[in-house]
């Protein structure tokens, strides 16, 4: 199977196919019978991406408004019990797209978590009753009179003073001890702890967004179809229940126009 053959078939179905766009920053993008493939992806990713986006089109033919709600596995597999499908499809997704595991982000979050624990230990050496969830009254009393209070909001801030002859002073979270020589080490640790908590929140939010995206039924289905091309035997072994149901529905004609495409690279 080659990409020209695939694109020709898609266009015969009335689909617009573009292979020289930015695809809205993605490898590929499907919307309202239009498939965009990024001009920036490698040649080996073109066919898998075409199949992925075509799977979205097929899904949209059996279930409307998937762009808004992500669709449902109940419709995709014409079954009311979908727990097994979901579990297997998530495993397939991890095979097809390593980014779906969020390993780098989780690793980064764990590093931040360890730093938070280290700063907490420093604080508790002098304030054993300190709790992250409670107000740190001793710190609050000190910080009100210190320019270091700006570091609670920003890791790096430039303070400008003077009306005619302006002076600037750069404060950073890395130079607290140098910039504020009178500050107790426990308070410096608390400022860094609060900074780490903000970073941890941002990383966790990104992980949650990615997991929500990858677990959308339409994305699970698209990566399943993509996986059948990239690693058919591995997909069969990883998702036997889903594969059997998919092949049954495929042969019954449940998925519009998909059987011809699947038969180009897979014996069903």
State what each model feature region is.
Residues 1-14:
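Zn2+-dependent metallopeptidase catalytic core
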Residues 17-18:
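Extracytoplasmic and endomembrane cell-envelope/extracellular-matrix remodeling and assembly machinery
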């Amino acid at each position: 199977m080659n990409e020209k053959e695939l694109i020709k078939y898609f266009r015969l179905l009335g689909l617009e196919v573009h292979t020289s766009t930015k695809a809205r920053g993605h490898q590929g993008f499907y919307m309202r019978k239009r498939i965009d493939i990024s001009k920036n992806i490698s040649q080996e990713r073109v066919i898998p991406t075409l199949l992925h986006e075509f799977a979205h089109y097929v899904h949209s033919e059996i279930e409307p408004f998937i762009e808004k709600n992500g669709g449902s596995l109940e419709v995709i597999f014409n079954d009311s019990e979908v727990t097994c499908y979901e579990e297997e499809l998530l495993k397939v997704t991890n095979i097809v797209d390593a980014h779906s595991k969020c390993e780098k982000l989780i690793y980064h979050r764990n590093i931040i978590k360890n730093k938070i624990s280290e700063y907490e230990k420093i604080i508790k050496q002098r304030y054993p009753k300190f709790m992250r969830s409670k107000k740190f009254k001793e710190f609050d009393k000190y910080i009100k009179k210190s320019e270091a209070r700006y570091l609670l909001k920003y890791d790096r801030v430039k303070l400008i003073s003077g009306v005619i002859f302006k002076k600037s002073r750069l404060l950073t979270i890395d130079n607290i001890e140098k910039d504020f020589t009178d500050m107790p080490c426990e308070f410096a640790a608390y400022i860094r702890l609060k900074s780490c908590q903000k970073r941890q929140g941002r990383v966790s939010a990104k992980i949650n967004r990615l997991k929500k995206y990858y677990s959308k039924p339409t994305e699970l289905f698209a990566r399943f179809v993509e996986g059948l091309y990239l690693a058919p035997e591995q997909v069969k072994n990883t998702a036997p229940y889903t594969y059997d149901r998919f092949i049954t529905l495929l042969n019954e004609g449940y998925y519009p126009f998909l059987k011809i495409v699947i038969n180009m690279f897979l014996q069903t």
